[in-house]
């Protein structure tokens, strides 16, 4: 993940500074896709990647499709939430150093 995103970002900046906006509909994660068991580690690590970059990602988790335990993990790995069109700082967010240490230490930076 890290190398692919780094490469994409570097390529996007070659002709001058560019802001990056990305969205991801996450319903695919409900399927038995190889590696999906590491999704929250990826989500947490993404915070390392986008730090200090002109990059905004919006992960779209359908609250009617994901169970409560998964949504709580989502909240712990995302610094902001959007609900009813309002962006707010997420009080449940955990810094990746903390979240990864407690939940997926093999993915620590």
Regions found by a protein language model. Name each.
Residues 1-109:
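Non-catalytic regulatory/interaction regions at protein termini and inter-domain linkers
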């Amino acid at each position: 993940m890290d190398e692919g995103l780094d490469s994409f970002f570097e390529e996007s900046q070659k002709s001058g500074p560019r802001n990056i906006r990305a969205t991801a509909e996450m319903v695919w994660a409900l399927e038995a896709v190889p590696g999906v068991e590491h999704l929250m580690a990826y989500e947490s690590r993404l915070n390392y990647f986008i730090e200090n970059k002109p990059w905004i990602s919006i992960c779209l988790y359908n609250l009617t499709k994901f169970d409560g335990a998964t949504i709580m993990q989502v909240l712990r790995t995302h610094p902001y939430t959007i609900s009813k069109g309002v962006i707010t700082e997420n009080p449940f967010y955990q810094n990746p150093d903390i979240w990864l240490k407690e939940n997926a230490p093999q993915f620590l930076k």
